[in-house]
Amino acid sequence: MSFKLFDKWDVTEVTVEDMGLQNYVCLDEIVVPHTMGRHVKRQFAKSKVSIVERLMNKIMRTERNSGKKNKAYSIVEDALEIINNKTKQNPVQVLVKAVENTAPREETTRIKYGGIGYQIAVDIAPQRRVDLSLGFITKGAMQSAFKNKKSAAQCLADEILLASDEDSRSFAVQKKEEKERVARSAH
């Protein structure tokens, strides 16, 4: 028996093309993306949580939506519906493409040597790449929804669509490029 996400979209046909992210973008078949926080106590267990639920959890991190899982659930469901209506594609595939396009590969870290701090470029772990990507997408969507007539779901759908096309108008793509540019300058 095959389950569809929100009883609408089949996740078995979704593919992750970025080889580094394949083990960290979970596409398990579930109807309701809500694990009740079972993954919290184990170190890398969040990579086994559905990518859609992780997007919901990132939406809940903003001040206005803190802890409001039902609100985040409806925002994500509506956003996926909008994406499906606009593109006629599986919206989970569009989300995965957006995550791949906005996941930075390099960032800087501070090294202190001899009392002097240096910025050096380091590769980012795949788990952190997915986290940063989802964070960029949700932050961009929530910022554009603030004091705007558009709903949060519409703004999230727009951000995901722009990010999946690697459009430079996307907040997430801009943040990724900024992070990688800073890392390149630290070489």
UniProtKB/Swiss-Prot annotation:
Cellular component terms (Gene Ontology): small ribosomal subunit
Keywords for this protein: Ribonucleoprotein, Ribosomal protein, RNA-binding, rRNA-binding
Name the UniProt record assigns to this protein: Small ribosomal subunit protein uS7
Coiled-coil ranges (or none): none
GO molecular function: rRNA binding; structural constituent of ribosome
Biological process annotations from GO: translation
Gene: rps7
Described purpose of this protein according to its UniProt entry: One of the primary rRNA binding proteins, it binds directly to 16S rRNA where it nucleates assembly of the head domain of the 30S subunit. Is located at the subunit interface close to the decoding center.
NCBIfam families registered for this protein in UniProt: PRK04027.1, uS7_euk_arch
Assembly notes: Part of the 30S ribosomal subunit.
